[in-house]
């Protein structure tokens, strides 16, 4: 092998090795920030297709309805505990130590993100409340043939008289 060909081969191998190292570091970083979404039934019984349950200490997102009558607030702090259930009957307890969103209510849909504990409770770091199901974006309303118009102040005033 002549020196020029040997130099090209060394450069190609180094380039491929560098790309492989960058790709593996990128995949490792993405894997550590991955939040898998589960329903309460999937946490209790495992995923329907694989039977895999989330492990304790794993960061996950849980979506479901807040069980009516399950919310317990600590009067001396922001700590709140509530249960989240789904239509399949699964239920998981969620603890949260911050201000709840304004739309949060019992019987309302939520998504909670946090770490699953050894006891099966989710220690939430973020709670997102879903919007009212009756809300319809203007684009959807327009597609359905409904008209949503805002009255300006002069029209509201004349309508009131």
Curated annotation (Swiss-Prot):
Q: Which GO terms describe its biological process?
A: cytochrome complex assembly
Q: Transmembrane segments in this chain: where?
A: 9-29
Q: Which GO terms describe its molecular function?
A: heme binding; metal ion binding
User: Which loops or segments lie on the Periplasmic side of the membrane, by the record?
Assistant: 30-161
Q: Where the protein is mainly located, per its record?
A: membrane
Which loops or segments lie on the Cytoplasmic side of the membrane, by the record? Answer: 1-8
Its biological purpose is as follows: Heme chaperone required for the biogenesis of c-type cytochromes. Transiently binds heme delivered by CcmC and transfers the heme to apo-cytochromes in a process facilitated by CcmF and CcmH.
Family listed = Belongs to the CcmE/CycJ family.
HAMAP family reported for this sequence: CcmE (MF_01959)
- What name is this protein filed under? Cytochrome c-type biogenesis protein CcmE
Q: What is the lineage of its organism?
A: Bacteria, Pseudomonadati, Pseudomonadota, Gammaproteobacteria, Alteromonadales
